[in-house]
């Protein structure tokens, strides 16, 4: 079930951030890349079932790292992730989103030319068991 959730979350992020931004799962990207990156680790996806035990909806708490050589690009990715609206026609598998936290990350001097933030979101995700 976690693997399906990871795929759903990855495709949702890719659709939102569009081209020019790389989306990674399960590993820290190569910081030599010249483009913006978004990554989340499978270990950081925590699923909890909603109160309705017959439902396929779960809550997924996801920590997403956004990095870019350009602060404006990093901020634009954060904004696009936070500005999502959801309706009945949504086919992404993500039914609702709640913002939990956003903070800047400190990296070692070898990669400090990247602007990086960690965004924590709580997603209501439809997982077919």
Please provide the spans of the model-predicted regions:
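Beta-hairpin (beta-strand-turn-beta-strand) motif
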Residues: 43-45, 67-69, 102
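Residues forming well-ordered secondary-structure scaffolds
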Residues: 4, 76, 112-116
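Mid-chain, well-packed structural core segment of small domains
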Residues: 67-87
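Hydrophobic beta-strand residues in large extracellular and virion-surface proteins
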Residues: 9, 13, 23, 38-40, ...
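Oligomerization/assembly interface segments of phage tail-like spikes and tubes
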Residues: 55-72, 115-126
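Small/polar-rich, solvent-exposed N-terminal microdomains that initiate assembly or binding
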Residues: 1-52, 72, 88-92
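Short, solvent-exposed beta-strand/turn "edge" segments of beta-rich domains on protein surfaces
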Residues: 49-57, 109-114
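Acidic-leaning, charged glycine-interspersed low-complexity segments
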Residues: 83-129
